[in-house]
Amino acid sequence: MKKLFVLLTALFTLTQVNAQEKNVIRIATDNTDLILQVAPNGRLYQAYLGDKLLNEKDINNFSPYVKGGSDGSVSTRGWEVYPGSGAEDYFEPAVAITHNDGNPSTILRYVSSEQKAVAGGTETVIQLKDDQYPVEVTLHYIAYPKENVIKTWSEIKHAEKKPVTIWRYASTMLYFSGNEYYLTEFSSDWAKEAQMSTQPLLFGKKVIDTKLGSRAAMHTHPFFELGFEQPAQETQGRAMLGTIGWTGNFQFTFEVDNVGNLRVIPAINPYASDYELKPNEVFTTPEFIFTFSNNGTGEASRNLHAWARNYQLKDGQGDRMTLLNNWENTYFKFDEKLLAELMKEAKHLGVDMFLLDDGWFGNKHPRNSDNAGLGDWEVMKSKLPGGIPALVKSAKEAGVKFGIWIEPEMINPKSELFEKHPDWAITLPNRETYYYRNQLVLDLSNPKVQDFVFGVVDNILTANPEVAFFKWDCNSPITNIYSPYLKNKQGQLYIDHVRGIYNVLERIKDKYPNVPMMLCSGGGARCDYEALKYFTEFWCSDNTDPIERLFIQWGFSQIFPAKAMDAHVTSWNKKTSVKFRTDVASMCKLGFDLGLKELNADEQTFCQNAVANWTRLKKVILDGDQYRLVSPYDGNHMSVMYAAPDKNKAVLYTYDIHPRFGEKLLPVKLQGLDAKKMYKVKEINL
């Protein structure tokens, strides 16, 4: 046995040496291998991306020259990992730079690589360099073995004498070879988020992008699914899920070339964003996160859910608070007495927190509608004379925590802030101003504006340290696209604006690491894994009609765990029962926008019991493995379940969306359980 062990060790060591000699870089999870190889020309190519290789020796059996074109030219290149522009490649580049001498070409050659342990996995860092210009690109890959997730991003820098212009800056580039590819995308609009549709990818380019800036994902979301040889299915077939962590303009390019190979290019959208990069300044691209499964999208989603809870989502291992929000109770019309009554209702309902929404601020220009007040973050004395301290006190007396709504990135022209600092708003200097929802976007590329936005949160928490939660809204895309701060560098606005937001959020996280925040953007128009480093959850949609929410939550659950998704019981579609509305909301992080006075005694008792049941089972719902059993896209029924990782407990939701006379009801096969165990089944929320 000892001899055999020595022999196996020797073979493994030899394999590692051979791999190094061939300049092979292996990026591996427990189920996936990404093999990169340096060719004799010094350039780095993708040699393999697929199932985990069972034999270590196989990593030496690949060639960087993998798929040639009909004229043979492509065969001299292969699938370059980070191809530049202006040379011999005929397709979309990963990076494009105009150098000081006007040359628009970039060719990167391999310099070095290293691997190091990081939380949950292994990071591979690869250095590339242009041999004609002092340009360097650093590729980063973090492989999370257990979750079968890979996260990748790139860094671009140069040492030319003057700034260069970069006009393509992909996070990465991935290649696939197959007979058929199918793309599932997630379109959106206000109250109609995460709508799934599937199409084949044929010759040419399919581009999904957004140009909206701040409310970036209002029309399309920053994630997708790929099905290989067939449309992506829930429980069978090979599927890939991908998402980019960028709270701004993003772009996915899917390009099928002349011999049927597919390139996937996730990136910041280069639209109106020729970026001036100073010498030795580092341009960091967004993270692209992806996972594979041979057992359909359900398993791939569970990969992402586990990864997010473990490593990406703010307080991913922590608890979540149920809440009562006043918005649909009061809109802008409230006072201290009414809010105190709602806090008592929150306690009676059994939730953890009362959340005060829009309409609490502004004095010279009071926020009694959406026409005024944004930017003036002082409590409205005429409405709330006791200020936030009085509200915190009332919440404490009622026995609930207190949270508050803010929209700190926005400004109304009717505000003291705009009167003092009109140059802080993104607006054109010589054209008629267009207002979206009567407001403008503050210019977060400006450090002074960043300080102001940070101060909105900091001032509230400094004066009121018992404020327990923020709902951070963003209701407008960027309009009137001009930054008074950037002046002649307008190509940097869309990018530096987002980076300014991250700077603010990083400062908040550093000073107040334990304060949970909800990400909201007129519904679900902000939903990415970079923002969720700073937010514990996001608001999926203003549409809380339970029928529509089944589709919306089904779509978002492809990428995000229930712990990150907020769902509230409201008065939308009052024709549906309170039970239906509550059951649908309890599939995610539960909240209420429904006043108890709207409910009869039986409905109030039902809601109290439902909150108690959700609280009792939230560990399974928020941290369990999700199994999507019956899709609402397939008919009149829908079913989802959550199973505890130890398989000792599960929660099952089933819905007959549009009951029909004499309809055929089919049994639902449960998943995530142990067939050898006996389970007690109990229906709840009756």
In which residue ranges do the predicted regions lie?
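Active-site neighborhood of glycoside hydrolase catalytic domains
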Residues: 380-387, 393, 397, 419-579, ...
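Short Pro-Gly-centered flexible turn/kink motifs
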Residues: 103-110, 275-294
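Bacterial Sec-dependent N-terminal signal peptides
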Residues: 1-22
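Aromatic- and carboxylate-lined catalytic core of secreted/periplasmic carbohydrate-active enzymes
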Residues: 585-589, 593-630
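Aromatic-lined carbohydrate-binding/catalytic grooves of carbohydrate-active enzymes
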Residues: 315-455, 464, 469
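Carbohydrate-binding surface patches
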Residues: 31, 224-226, 234, 631-674
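Conserved, mostly hydrophobic/aromatic
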Residues: 31, 154, 280, 324, ...
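Polysaccharide-binding surfaces and accessory modules of carbohydrate-active proteins
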Residues: 21-35, 44-255, 271, 678-685
